[in-house]
């Protein structure tokens, strides 16, 4: 597919089905991470804009054109959005690449997943109609009970910059499928395609207020959304410290939250792997895909001593072969990280690892052939101790740290030696061993003989400090539904006979 040359659309905030200028008229620069140039501006919402969006959402839930829709009717909107996204795939992939820095072919693949995700939740929305009211059998014949599954209400969706439109879809699609009215606050570092989703919703005729999109800074737009008394739920994907702030603010209103936070996931490699090159490639993919900016990245390689020298030698050869370039170039496999702040943070992690006694086996700096942009070489760090920062903390960049083990028990201990619990991988041909590790891993996701494949049908989420709640699959739809019990006394002519009846005069 040819990569189009396009201009950056100049959008406003998307509120109540219309483009509206922020009340304070503030805008933020869009910086292309590949060349550090300002390529446009996004609107910066503040508390007043949040309040307008919440009022629009409440109004949408009261109106018949959204609040009274069936699942089948909502499914038509979701399928129309999917079709429009597919139609605009080349443009959206290009916008995402110049906004986020990921290789264009990865961005294009993400857009395919966006389409599939909207279609999947369209199917689930239709299925909701037959599940909306479910009878519950009781032990007393004088009562009957059923359960209603209703939209939770107005939901705030706060999304990250590493998969801008895809992470948006992970939240928007199930929220709309459930019949909620959603307010999206994407990361200010990569908002372009989320704003384009607003234009797509306008084009397909999504009822006003069903989805509003507010770009801007976290403390100016995100915080007021979280603490707004008329927002019924918050779903957040992002950093642990921000997740703690969101959880604390939401707790003041006893507001439910879903949190998908950071990770420091292990990939455990045994000496009985099926194929050396296949195992090496999965190890690279698990850490360096999406420029290393993946919450579930298997960035801790835990490898059996007996295969470590051979494996690391081959890993080094493969790593040196990774094409680092402008992400719009053909065959680019590693682009820039998202921002100068992230670039400096990653280099500081690498520097600290070296100061603490680790060895930089490869990388650790800017590629020599790229003078501008936030590029960092894929980096492999060995001689790592479990007390080191590089072992403990999420880097969120193309940095792999390595530690060896002798026996299974040691590998499990190392794998679980983390405050996080999002993902974990094991590479071994011994499936009984893989099953033991599946049970022993303290994580929400386990990969066997692979790393990072992600599908929209199974659940996605972690444990420990990686958050709680699940996205994707039917589990995500449940996040946006309220379960209401309805019990009827079916023998109203018969007295309940709890109190003594007054004497008749």
From Swiss-Prot:
GO terms of molecular function: 3-aminopropanal dehydrogenase (NAD+) activity; 4-trimethylammoniobutyraldehyde dehydrogenase activity; aminobutyraldehyde dehydrogenase (NAD+) activity; betaine-aldehyde dehydrogenase (NAD+) activity; gamma-guanidinobutyraldehyde dehydrogenase (NAD+) activity; protein homodimerization activity; sodium ion binding
Site for Transition state stabilizer, residues: 162
GO term, biological process aspect, one: glycine betaine biosynthetic process from choline
Positions contributing to Na(+) binding: 31, 99, 189
Enzyme active site: 260, 295
Superkingdom of the organism of origin: Eukaryota
Residues the record lists as binding NAD(+): 159-161, 185-188, 238-242, 261, 394, 460
Enzyme Commission no: 1.2.1.-, 1.2.1.47, 1.2.1.19, 1.2.1.54
Keywords (A to Z) from UniProt: Metal-binding, NAD, Oxidoreductase, Sodium
CDD domains: ALDH_F10_BADH
Membrane-traversing stretches: none
Pathway noted in the entry: Amine and polyamine biosynthesis; betaine biosynthesis via choline pathway; betaine from betaine aldehyde: step 1/1
Reaction catalyzed: 4-aminobutanal + NAD(+) + H2O = 4-aminobutanoate + NADH + 2 H(+); 3-aminopropanal + NAD(+) + H2O = beta-alanine + NADH + 2 H(+); 4-(trimethylamino)butanal + NAD(+) + H2O = 4-(trimethylamino)butanoate + NADH + 2 H(+); 4-guanidinobutanal + NAD(+) + H2O = 4-guanidinobutanoate + NADH + 2 H(+)
Pfam families: Aldedh (PF00171)
Subunit field text: Forms homodimers.
Protein family membership: Belongs to the aldehyde dehydrogenase family.
Protein task: Dehydrogenase that catalyzes the oxidation of several aminoaldehydes. Metabolizes and detoxifies aldehyde products of polyamine degradation to non-toxic amino acids. Catalyzes the oxidation of 4-aminobutanal and 3-aminopropanal to 4-aminobutanoate and beta-alanine, respectively. Catalyzes the oxidation of 4-(trimethylamino)butanal and 4-guanidinobutanal to 4-trimethylammoniobutanoate and 4-guanidinobutanoate, respectively.
The protein's name in its UniProt record: Aminoaldehyde dehydrogenase 2
Gene: AMADH2
């Amino acid at each position: 597919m040819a990569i189009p040359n396009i201009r950056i659309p100049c959008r406003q905030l998307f509120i109540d089905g219309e483009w509206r200028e922020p009340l304070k008229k503030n805008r933020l620069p869009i910086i292309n991470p590949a060349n550090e140039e300002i390529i446009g501006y996004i609107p910066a919402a503040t508390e007043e804009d949040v309040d307008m969006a919440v009022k629009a959402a409440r109004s949408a839930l009261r109106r018949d054109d959204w609040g009274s829709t069936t699942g089948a009717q909502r499914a038509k909107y979701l399928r129309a959005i999917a079709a429009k996204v597919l139609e605009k795939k080349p443009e959206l992939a290009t916008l995402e690449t110049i906004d986020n820095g990921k290789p264009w072919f990865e961005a294009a693949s993400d857009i395919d997943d966006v389409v599939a995700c909207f279609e999947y939740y369209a199917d689930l929305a239709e299925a909701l109609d037959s599940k909306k009211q479910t009878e519950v059998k009781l032990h007393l014949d004088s009562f009957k009970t059923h359960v209603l599954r209703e939209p939770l209400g107005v939901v705030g969706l706060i999304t990250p910059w590493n998969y801008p439109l895809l992470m948006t879809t992970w939240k928007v699609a199930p929220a709309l499928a459930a019949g909620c009215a959603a307010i999206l606050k994407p990361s200010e570092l990569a908002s372009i395609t989320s704003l384009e989703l607003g234009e797509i919703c306008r084009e397909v005729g999504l009822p006003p207020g069903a989805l509003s999109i507010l770009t801007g800074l976290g403390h100016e737009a995100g915080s007021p959304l979280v603490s707004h008394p008329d927002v019924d739920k918050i779903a957040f994907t992002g950093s642990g410290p921000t997740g703690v702030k969101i959880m604390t603010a939401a707790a003041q209103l006893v507001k439910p939250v879903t949190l998908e936070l950071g990770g420091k996931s292990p990939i455990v490699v045994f000496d009985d792997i099926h194929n050396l090159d296949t195992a090496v490639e999965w190890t690279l993919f698990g850490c360096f895909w999406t420029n290393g900016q993946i919450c579930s990245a298997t960035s801790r390689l835990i490898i059996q001593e007996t295969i470590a020298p051979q494996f690391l030698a081959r890993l080094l050869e493969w790593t040196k072969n990774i094409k680092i370039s402008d992400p719009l170039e053909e065959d680019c496999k590693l682009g820039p990280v998202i921002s100068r702040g992230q670039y400096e943070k990653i280099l500081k992690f690498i520097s600290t690892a070296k100061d603490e006694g680790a060895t930089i086996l490869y990388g650790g700096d800017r590629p020599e052939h790229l003078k501008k942009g936030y590029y960092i070489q894929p980096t492999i760090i060995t001689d790592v101790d479990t007390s080191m920062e590089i072992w403990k903390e999420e880097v969120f960049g193309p940095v792999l740290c390595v530690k060896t083990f002798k026996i299974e028990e040691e590998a499990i201990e190392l794998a679980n030696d983390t405050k996080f619990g999002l993902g974990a991988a094991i590479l071994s041909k011994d499936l009984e061993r893989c099953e033991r590790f599946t049970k022993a891993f303290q994580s929400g996701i386990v990969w066997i003989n692979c790393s990072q494949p992600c599908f929209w049908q199974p659940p996605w989420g972690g444990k420990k400090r990686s958050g709680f709640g699940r996205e994707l699959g039917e589990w995500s739809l449940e996040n946006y539904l309220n379960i209401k019990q309805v019990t009827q006394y079916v023998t109203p002519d018969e007295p309940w006979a709890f109190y003594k009846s007054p004497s008749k005069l």
